[in-house]
Amino acid sequence: MEQLVYIALLGALGCLCRYFLSGFVYQVFGTSFPYGTLAVNLIGAFLIGLIMEFSVRSAAIPPTLRFAITIGFLGGLTTFSTFSFETFRLLEDGALLIAIVNVLVSVVACLTCTWIGIMVARAL
């Protein structure tokens, strides 16, 4: 039960971080492209690569903390559902090219950020 509390608390923190970070990114770059969602997903992809690889190679992150961070915080920070909704809206609005770019950039860049996180963890 204690682990569920940690997951919930860090999940709430991740949600708040997503709200403020994506809002800031949209203020800076505008809303013509889902920049805010892309930003939080890129950060989350990097962090999950870093944390998971580091925890596999080291006992420095106990499983309870790893689950709280990855399932809770990163689960709250990142958002596949918003990515899906924003892409669907782009398609509905006739912005086919922007929707395709969003899908391709999101998938390729998130995989790349995960890989970079793994490489950083291996270098530590």
UniProtKB/Swiss-Prot annotation:
Pfam family, one: CRCB
Keywords: Cell inner membrane, Cell membrane, Ion channel, Ion transport, Membrane, Metal-binding, Sodium, Transmembrane, Transmembrane helix, Transport
GO-annotated cellular components: plasma membrane
InterPro entries assigned to the protein according to its UniProt record, in alphabetical order: FluC
Residue ranges crossing the lipid bilayer per the database entry: 5-25, 32-52, 67-87, 96-116
Membrane topology summary: Multi-pass membrane protein
Binding-site residues, Na(+): G75, T78
PANTHER family assigned to the protein according to its UniProt record, in alphabetical order: FLUORIDE EXPORT PROTEIN 1-RELATED
Protein's recorded name: Fluoride-specific ion channel FluC
Gene this chain is encoded by: fluC
